Structures are given as C-alpha cells and as structure tokens.
Amino acid sequence: MGLKNLIIRGRNYISDHLTKSSLEKAIIRRQKRGKVIENEKLIILGCGWGSYSFLKNLNSIKYDITVISPRNHFLFTPLLTSSAVGTLEFRSIAEPVRTTRDINEFKYIQASVTSINPENNSVLVKSTFHNEKPFEMKYDKLVIGVGSRNNTFGIKGVEENANFLKELHHAREIRQKIIECFERASLPDVSTEERERLLSFVIVGGGATGIEFTSELNDFFSEDLSRLFPFVPVNEVKIILLEASGKILSTFDQKLVKKALINFRNSGIDVRTHSSVKEVLKDYVILDNGDRIPYGLLVWSTGIGQHPLVKNSSFEKDSHDRIIVDDHLRVKNYSNVFSFGDCANVENKNYPPTAQVASQSAVYLAKEFNNLEKLNPNPPKPFAFKFLGLLAYTGKKSGILQTDFFDLSGFIGFITWRSAYLTRLGSLRSKIQVPFDWMRTLIFGRDISSF
C-alpha cells in the first residue's frame, strides 16, 4: 500500500511539474504596460556540439524554441573511434535530442533545412521521411549550428569506396567491415593475394581522428582479433596511415608527435607522410607517386568540408565557405541570425574547427540570449575562445596531452584522456554507460558479432 501511494504521488508530481512548465510558456508571457508579449520564435538548426550546448544552457521561458535536425541525437564525437571497434557501444555516446531538457520547453522536428531566407525571416524545411512536401517556418531569431561535412577534395572514388567516420552509422559500417575482412580472410579457399588485401587497413588523414582510429584499430587487432582468429597470419595484417603533409597531428608539439610515432612504430603501424591520394578504387588506392596500395577497409579522415546549406546561403562567407560572424556571433549584416561551430568563423579570428570552440561559443551565446532583457548599462563582452588543451589517444593505453602550461604522455596521458572525456559526456546515463563499457571490454574483450 505504501509503495502504491509513493508511485501515485510521484506521477502527480511529474504531471504537475510538466503542466507548470508548459503553463509558464503559455501564460507567463512577458507583460509590458498591460500588454501580453508573445515569446520570440527561436529556431535552432542542428544538434551537434554547438547546438546541443546552446539548447542546454538557454533560458526557455523567453523563447518558443524549435530545434530542426535530420539527426535526432547528439553524438559525442571524440569517442566515435572507440565505438567503431567495439570498445564502446553506440548508444553510450549518443544522447537523444528530446531528452536534452524538459520536452515541454522546446519542439523538435526531424528534418533538414534546405534554404534560408534571411530577408523574409524564414527557412524552408524538408522532412527526412519520404514523400513529405517542404514547408516554410518563420523565425524571430535563427541560430545556425549545422556543423560540417566530410571533405573529399574532389578526389575520384572517395565517395563511392571509402568509409567515413562522422556519424554513428559510419562507425557501425566500419565495425562490420573489419569483422567481415577477418572472417573472409579465414576462409580455407581464399588466395594469399586476396587474404593480404583483406587484411590491409588504410587510414587517410593524420589528424586527431585518423590517429585515434588507427590506435583503436591496432588495439582491436592485438587484444581481440589476433586471439579470436588464430589461423589468420599475424604478419599479413597491415595498418597503413597516409598523411599528405610532412607531419601527423599538425596541431601538437613536435616532441609529442615523436612519442606518438614511436608508439606506432613499436606497434608495427606503417606511417607514410607526404603521401597524397590520387584516386580510390574498389580494392586499392592510387597515390600521387603512382604507388598502388590494396585494402580491405579504407577510412577517410582528412578534415572538414562545408554543409550544403551554408555553401548555398546568401550570407557572407570566408575563403573556407564558413559564415562570417562578429565577436558576438551575429551573422554579418543580419542582427537576428547567429552561427557557431564548424560552419562559422569569427571575423579576423580564425578559430580552429573543434568541439571546444563550438561548445564555448554556444554557451557564450546562450548567456547572451538569457541576459538580453536584464537592465545592464554595460555592453556584453565579446566572445573569446579559451584554449583548454589538446588530447589524442595513441594506442596501447598511451595518450598525449598538450596545454599552455604542461604536456603529458604515456599511461598518464591515457588516463587524462579518458577522464577528460568522461567529465564532458552530456548526460548521467552516458557517464554511467561509458565506464561500464570500458570495464566490459577490459574483462571480456570487444564484441565481434555481425548484425
């Protein structure tokens, strides 16, 4: 009887809380001189690092908020490489948009915005579901945080044959492809040449994502696949990292890069700098120097390209097709349109396109929005990015950390890498699931089931 009463009281509390939240939006409209003033219509485009941070920190009482994104979850991208090899499960690094905050405080539409009309204060929206007609939505304020796309540099065959690593479905495809390569290589009738191709894994791009995926892949092989596929010749497994420039991890200090390279070479990873890709075919990649490298899996991680919505917009853009914003993140010439993250650049600043910048700028903008009606005679301070450091996992329980004050490497760098990302996860659920996955992998190994 006591438990039943407790459940009923809990339901009543939740119902009252949700009703109050919605009533606050509907009834506690701001009043000035006896007139009811409707909340401004605020549309947020995207649900990446910027948009997610902005939504979490925004005071929803002042706005009628609508989030529009074809992806219905926030993705913790720094750990995407871990999910691609089974160290973490996919759901552990994804946070549904609808659970970001009280669902009565905003609307979510699973759709893509195909065009923006800033003169008419409207966006054209197309549902992600088939055969849905586009529709127009009006806004008083617009926040653009659609992120970026994969950059193929126009190289022939990349779109058709390479695997990207930017979304959850990319990680799922890569994990399945790795397992498929080992299963096919273990067939009794496979030729030596075909087996060597299947066991060659090529990663294009020596930035943080390329380095971390290479590290995770090598861990997957040395800790799990080599044990579970005993008849696959160890000496035939090749991991090749291609970097067009002369240096991997170009944003890190050279001494940390050297430590990463030593770790890679000790693991048998083939790092090739000054190696530009000319063309990607179904079974091999052609380099500028004419070399042909056969592969079973090729992962493309070579920087970012701009979102079509941004590229085709009428906003003023920089040489990298990013929307130019002022130091208050307002789009040039439009005081009611704002942008942050990979798709925007503060004029004359050239901040790096990282999750750090996107998150900090979004929190800044949310505070600006929250303070708009406060009687503050002082103008708001401009946005200033605060560098918090660079992190990268380099395999074999080793990592590197670079800050303005100190550097770390080795096992302590690995612990710092994990700790830093654990604290940055978006929800309590993720903060419980991720360490649970780490412990499961440590005890039982990574899952190699195909599904």
UniProtKB/Swiss-Prot annotation:
InterPro entries according to UniProt: FAD/NAD-bd_sf (IPR036188), FAD/NAD-binding_dom (IPR023753), NDH-2 (IPR045024), NDH2-like_C (IPR054585)
Signal peptide positions on this chain: none
Ligand binding (NAD(+)): 199-236
One of the record's GO cellular component terms: mitochondrion
Residue ranges of the TM segments: none
Entry annotated with the keyword Magnesium: no
GO-annotated molecular function: NADH dehydrogenase (ubiquinone) activity; oxidoreductase activity
Reactions it catalyzes: a ubiquinone + NADH + 5 H(+)(in) = a ubiquinol + NAD(+) + 4 H(+)(out)
Amino-acid biosynthesis in keyword set: no
Keywords, alphabetical: FAD, Flavoprotein, NAD, Oxidoreductase, Translocase
EC number of the protein: 7.1.1.2
Binding site for FAD: 41-71
Cofactor: FAD
UniProt similarity note: Belongs to the NADH dehydrogenase family.
Protein name per UniProt: Probable NADH dehydrogenase
Organism: Dictyostelium discoideum (Social amoeba)
Lineage summary: Eukaryota, Amoebozoa, Evosea, Eumycetozoa, Dictyostelia
